[in-house]
Structures are given as structure tokens and as C-alpha cells.
Amino acid sequence: MGKRILTVGEPMGLLIAQEEGGLDEVKHFTSAIAGAEFNVAVGLTRLGHTVGYLTRVGRDPFGRQICRYMKQIGLDTGLTRVDQGRRTGFMLQSRTSQGDPDIYY
């Protein structure tokens, strides 16, 4: 049995461009979840630890996606709150074959 761990952070929706070009020109995106602490929580859960995630998401498509994924992988959602009055943050990421992608929050 793994250790019990608590992580605290801000998960975000992530839209990743599926073709190269400026984000104002791209037509197709893939939806994912981002956030440094979220990634740590997911990794620790996959290693067999019991992980709680203290956070707040909005009652919106990104918030629902995040909560659904947390439950799907077995991440403890007992300390995750859904806020009626706020939206979940998100970021846009460009696709590039050279250098770093453009990222907007």
C-alpha cells in the first residue's frame, strides 16, 4: 500500500493546436488537462499512492472534464470543490516543429 499524499494546485483546461501556425489561424485543437501540481497528483496516483487534490474548478466544460478524469484514475476528489460563480482556467498551446510553442493563459 502506498502513502497518503495531499497535493494543492490549479488544474487547467488545455487546448493544443493540431497544426502549425499562429493560434489565430489554427482550426483544430485537442483538449487535455494541464497544471504542474495536477501532473504530480496523477503520477503519484499511477504509482499506487492515495492522493488527495485540494483545488477548486468552475462549473463549466473544463471543470467537468477535470473532475471526470480525476474520478476515472482514482484521484481522491473529496477536497475538490466546484465553484458556481467562477470559471476554470485554461491555456492555449501552439504546435511547432522547432523551438518552444506559444502558450497563452
Each language-model region and where it sits:
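Short, surface-exposed alpha-helical segments at coil->helix boundaries
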Residues: 34, 38, 64-67
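Conserved N-terminal subdomain of the carbohydrate kinase-like
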Residues: 50, 54-105
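Short pre-catalytic strand/loop immediately N-terminal to key active-site residues, enriched for Gly-Thr
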Residues: 24-34
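Gly/Ser/Thr-rich helix-start
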Residues: 10, 35-36, 59, 90
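Positively charged, low-complexity intrinsically disordered leader regions
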Residues: 1-23
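Alpha-helix C-terminal capping segments
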Residues: 32, 39-50, 95
